[in-house]
Amino acid sequence: MKLVVCEAHLYINCVGEKKLLGATVTSDLKWDKNVELMTRQANINMKYLHSAKKFFHDTKILKQIYLTWIRNNVEFGAVVWHSSLTQELELKIERIQKAAVRVIMGNNYTTYDEGLQRLKLDKLSERRRKICLTFAKKSLKLKQFSKLFPLNDNDHNMLKRNGNRYVINQHLTERYKVSTIPYLQRLLNEDFHERKKQFKRILSPVDINVCYTAGKI
């Protein structure tokens, strides 16, 4: 993007898309182009996996090739764009891993879910969710980033059974609702509630009758 200064006026050339820090941003703020470029590169790199399959049948080696040369391509900058993906784009990205699992498993491939279980892999959508949550948690430890996730000081809210720990930015549009910051705020609250449930389960009183029965067995 070029800047042209003319006396008191500043002219900016408008472009339809721009690559910023590895992510392709378009003027409509959609991620179709970014996903297209990522999946295209991932499909190109799939040749490494197909070539390796001719010489290796060890799934550990093939899995490592996939993680190094293919999966990285479809996860770069995921924190920025994951929450705004349409279902169609999510499926397009997931198909990359599905194809890779089929190659790695070879004749042992039955279903995608079973392949993931045997290779100890998460679905890409779940991995992106974990990446986003990890980013949000790390941001809480940084002074500048933690300001994006203010604690909820509303006493009435905190007294509620499902009161949120972190403020969720109000939104007037669906686009802002699914954008990165509100999404990360919701993730932090979901994680807070989940950890609170786990803590309650640990502290919950043990059923004496169950213990007695187990002891007799």
Predicted regions, residues:
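Short, conserved micro-motifs composed of acidic
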Residues: 1-16
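Intrinsically disordered, low-complexity regulatory regions of eukaryotic regulatory proteins
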Residues: 5, 56, 73, 151-153, ...
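Short, glycine-/Ser/Thr-/acidic-enriched flexible segments
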Residues: 10, 26, 30, 185-187
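Surface polyanion/phosphate-binding segment centered on an Asp-His-Pro turn
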Residues: 12-16, 28, 33, 37-41, ...
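Non-catalytic, peripheral interaction segments enriched in hydrophobic/basic residues
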Residues: 17-144
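Short linear motifs embedded in intrinsically disordered, charge-biased segments
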Residues: 86-88, 92-217
